Swiss-Prot record:
Belongs to the bacterial ribosomal protein bS18 family. Keywords: Ribonucleoprotein, Ribosomal protein, RNA-binding, rRNA-binding. GO terms for cellular component: cytosolic small ribosomal subunit. Binds as a heterodimer with protein bS6 to the central domain of the 16S rRNA, where it helps stabilize the platform of the 30S subunit. This is Small ribosomal subunit protein bS18. HAMAP family: Ribosomal_bS18. Part of the 30S ribosomal subunit. Forms a tight heterodimer with protein bS6. GO terms for molecular function: small ribosomal subunit rRNA binding; structural constituent of ribosome. It holds the Pfam family Ribosomal_S18. InterPro entries: Ribosomal_bS18, Ribosomal_bS18_CS, Ribosomal_bS18_sf. PANTHER family: 30S RIBOSOMAL PROTEIN S18, SMALL RIBOSOMAL SUBUNIT PROTEIN BS18M. GO terms for biological process: translation. It comes from Thermotoga maritima (strain ATCC 43589 / DSM 3109 / JCM 10099 / NBRC 100826 / MSB8).
Length: 75
């Protein structure tokens, strides 16, 4: 039996659509959308972010963790 491939839904970068030039580490509500329930950073192939904004999100999350605004682990 032949299986048909499903077309992948093309995800667009939400941060590009919002026209953000800078991802602020103090915006924990936005940053928490890019974390799993255990506190790990979601990869860009799942979020649909472009490379530029994924790097900004990564750096902002790491800064927020260091400042104590976001937890390293969620238990």
């Amino acid at each position: 039996m032949a299986y048909r491939r499903r077309k992948k839904k093309i995800k667009k970068c939400r941060l590009c659509e919002m026209k953000l030039d800078y991802v602020d580490y103090k915006d924990t509500r936005l940053l928490s959308e890019f974390l799993t329930d255990k506190g790990k950073i979601i990869p860009k192939r799942l979020t649909g972010n472009c490379s530029k904004h994924q790097r900004m999100v990564k750096v902002a999350i790491k800064r927020a963790r260091q400042m104590g605004l976001l937890p390293y682990l969620k238990i």
